[in-house]
């Protein structure tokens, strides 16, 4: 069967549905069609084709709830070019744009005031130099608990963050590793929930039950560290009010603890929190606080689905639909979102703007609206050395994460002599608590064996150990039973050993960011610390490159006769 030339304008065979329209014609035999061909609409044929829609309606951008974003982009482009130019194809066909009834609804009037009005940012810079927690307005019961734990003066980042979070602002907390970021968000949260909160008139009538704060961490070690911090502040009688939901632990016991203890704070890893939430065992719709610790790691692709569920369910009123016309802005306003990390690359800034409501960036002695931060665009061409490229931003983030009171050195050694150099380094610096980093798990045991053979107490820590074994190793290391902890990249984040006075890189870190994370294990809370990198002669150029990127003096040295000898070296650019 063929279509004649005279019939092509009036009799066009169309396969139409609510999703697409396929047009066949102009002397095309059916037998030659193995699959339908999609061709452009002819001007004369367009007027004769009627769109067939099913009951569910057409698949449009409006039905996907992304129409507003497209319109915004079009308006932005029109502003740059001086006006919206009609499409040449649309003008040729005399097409009129179809207005969706979905878009005709007054969205702004439906939004609650809390989602529309911006919060007033009040900054009392005198609090940046606060000498006590009383000056920050914490409740008396909480201050008493802090005094019993020996915590009397806030750090710089705590002085800046506590008042901002107490004013109900969404915040991004950025400070170097070991500066006290965990307490910077825990203290204002515990001022609002739990037995240590400040008394209010609603206490007698408030029957809120369930989880009120969810803290997400990328690793089990960091999650358990946060749990211990909360338990320490709550005290032995109320530590049941915090529950860990980390991967690797027994899930059924975690679910039983949720049912029995009814915790107000949940701390866990994305996968386990999402898993228990999907099973209906964790209810977070009435949650008031969502904290994402080490958020730059939580933005990784492997956390995407779990983080999507957490962001959709935590602090969202039960009974609302995912396609509610109020949109994500209203849902964000139902909770207070706090993002925390030692590094704040451009990806974190974009995430904060998307997940939070008028967030502010909190640094030591500094609080600024996040909207004032310029987000660099990806560079397609070769970037200039002085350009504001994303790679330069990442390097700057690594610089910001380094504790300020560190000394950096590097020495050269043959691969087979690295362990002996490690031992001589520890003796020369008289270090008592040492963390040695390697890139792989397999050689850890060999390094521990060689150190033990020379009379130096050492142990290993890696991901293949079970949860109980890891906890035991960390406890013994913190208690001083082991002098050296040999580990891999697993512990570069979240490992909190305040007494650590020396970090040694037995293997070179992969980049300057990983160097900064490793170095952050020492020099915590203002203490002094030392970082030594042991490399081969052929690897010294990598150290010089990281020195340039981090803008810190990594000095060449050697260890002879039980002493540290520092060499002078001109910078090699």
UniProtKB/Swiss-Prot annotation:
Signal peptide: none
Residue ranges annotated for the Helicase ATP-binding domain, each copy included: 162-362
InterPro entries: DEAD/DEAH_box_helicase_dom, DEAD_box_RNA_helicases, Helicase_ATP-bd, Helicase_C-like, P-loop_NTPase, RNA_helicase_DEAD_Q_motif
Domain Helicase C-terminal: 421-565
Catalytic activity: ATP + H2O = ADP + phosphate + H(+)
A Pfam family matched in the record: DEAD
GO molecular function terms attached to this record: ATP binding; ATP hydrolysis activity; RNA binding; RNA helicase activity
Domain of life: Eukaryota
Binding site for ATP: 175-182
Alphabetic keyword roster: ATP-binding, Helicase, Hydrolase, Nucleotide-binding, RNA-binding
Motif (Q motif): 131-159
Record EC number: 3.6.4.13
Renumbered ranges of motif DEAD box: 293-296
Domains as described in the record: The Q motif is unique to and characteristic of the DEAD box family of RNA helicases and controls ATP binding and hydrolysis.
PANTHER family to which the protein is assigned, alphabetical: DEAD-BOX ATP-DEPENDENT RNA HELICASE 47, MITOCHONDRIAL
Similarity-based family: Belongs to the DEAD box helicase family.
Protein name (record): DEAD-box ATP-dependent RNA helicase 47A
Source species taxonomy: Eukaryota, Viridiplantae, Streptophyta, Embryophyta, Tracheophyta
